[in-house]
């Protein structure tokens, strides 16, 4: 398996990408193509001692910066690292593309180069969240700020297939994020989406509230990209604040400092559970190929784990299974409303 890595788009330059690629090649038995400015990448590889023969370089003279409009990619940056990396997936040279760069640029490249899965109206970014029972998927978390009920239904179908792959569960529990558990709670879009999801073949458990997302009540949580992105950013902020408060309390008293050796292990485990680097990246579901989107500040560990997930999805042909489910849903007549 070969993975195309946009090595130029991250906040910290190509170094974390190169280090993550080396770790992935060593631990995951995967070939990685570093896509970016050839001279820069060769210099960085030499500086970091990255000589693994499974790491190769594909020249891309342009870079999409974080502040640039994603629309500019299709108009004037088709020689950018993210565009060329995505083309490697389209041609079949790579099984997936991973990028810590401009999220919008990744989406635009996937849309124009790979194309939407047949029948999919909108793609969705699916992130992984830690729960009391393990892990859950939430989608969409930023690809679409405005959604229809049909879009949310399709997010449920796509998330269900990703959940089958990720959790090795034949029938993941799918919930709809809302302001109450009752069927009648929510706005008009979510109430209509509730009806569509309930009539589908999914293991739909109904509405889930924000407080239930991390309890493990649902394996897949469906929402629009505006709500999902806000919820994700709040969660990241809360996790970071709790971590800082804990350290402040521990270091602020002699009793805390005395007890630290006894609680260091559990604290380290907690940090690992909520660390985004453990999950690596979030796939863009609903396109004809595997696109993995990472944090701009991704570490080498995060890049390695994003490659791990991208490799697994490519080997599992998750995008093809999503297409099958979408086609089946479109071929199935809507259920008659109950009396």
Residue positions per predicted region:
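Glycine-rich phosphate/diphosphate-binding loop of Rossmann-like nucleotide-binding domains
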Residues: 15-16, 28-33, 39-42, 145-210, ...
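Phosphate/nucleotide-donor binding subsite
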Residues: 50-94
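Short beta-strand segments
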Residues: 6, 35-36, 58, 99-101, ...
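N-terminal glycine-rich anion-binding loop in soluble enzyme alpha/beta folds
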Residues: 15-66
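Short glycine/serine/threonine-rich phosphate/pyrophosphate-binding segments
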Residues: 13-17, 78-92, 96-110, 121-126, ...
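Short, glycine-rich nucleotide/cofactor-binding loops
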Residues: 4-15, 74, 143-153, 293-300
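Glycine-rich phosphate/nucleotide-binding loop
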Residues: 111-125, 130-138, 217-221, 225-337
């Amino acid at each position: 398996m070969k993975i195309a890595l946009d090595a130029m788009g991250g906040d910290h330059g190509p170094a974390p990408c190169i280090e993550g690629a080396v770790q992935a090649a060593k631990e995951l038995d995967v070939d990685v193509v570093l896509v970016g400015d050839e001279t820069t990448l060769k210099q960085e590889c030499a500086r970091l001692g990255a000589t693994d023969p499974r790491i190769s370089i594909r020249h891309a003279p342009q870079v999409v910066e974080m502040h640039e409009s994603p629309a500019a990619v299709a108009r004037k940056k088709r020689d950018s690292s993210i565009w060329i990396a995505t083309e490697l997936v389209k041609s079949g040279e790579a099984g997936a593309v991973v990028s810590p760069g401009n999220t919008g640029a990744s989406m635009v490249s996937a849309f124009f180069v790979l194309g939407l899965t047949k029948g999919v109206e909108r793609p969705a970014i699916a992130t992984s969240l830690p729960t009391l029972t393990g892990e859950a998927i939430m989608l969409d978390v930023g690809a679409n700020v405005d959604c229809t009920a049909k879009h949310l239904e399709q997010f449920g179908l796509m998330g269900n297939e990703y959940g089958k792959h990720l959790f090795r569960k034949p029938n993941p529990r799918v919930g709809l994020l809302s302001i109450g558990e009752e069927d009648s709670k929510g706005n008009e879009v979510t109430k209509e989406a509730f009806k569509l999801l309930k009539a589908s073949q999914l293991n739909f458990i109904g509405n889930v509230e924000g407080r239930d997302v991390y309890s493990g009540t649902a394996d897949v949580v469906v929402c629009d990209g505006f709500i999902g992105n806000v919820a994700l950013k709040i969660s990241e902020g809360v996790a970071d604040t709790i971590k800082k408060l804990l350290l402040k309390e521990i270091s602020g008293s002699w009793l805390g400092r005395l007890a630290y050796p006894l609680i260091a292990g559990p604290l380290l485990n907690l940090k690992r559970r909520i660390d985004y680097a453990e999950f690596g990246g979030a796939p863009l579901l609903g396109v004809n190929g595997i696109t993995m989107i990472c944090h701009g500040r991704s570490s080498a560990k995060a890049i390695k784990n994003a490659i791990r997930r991208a490799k697994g999805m490519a080997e599992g042909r998750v995008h093809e299974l999503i297409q099958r489910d979408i086609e089946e849903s479109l071929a199935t007549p809507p259920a008659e409303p109950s009396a």
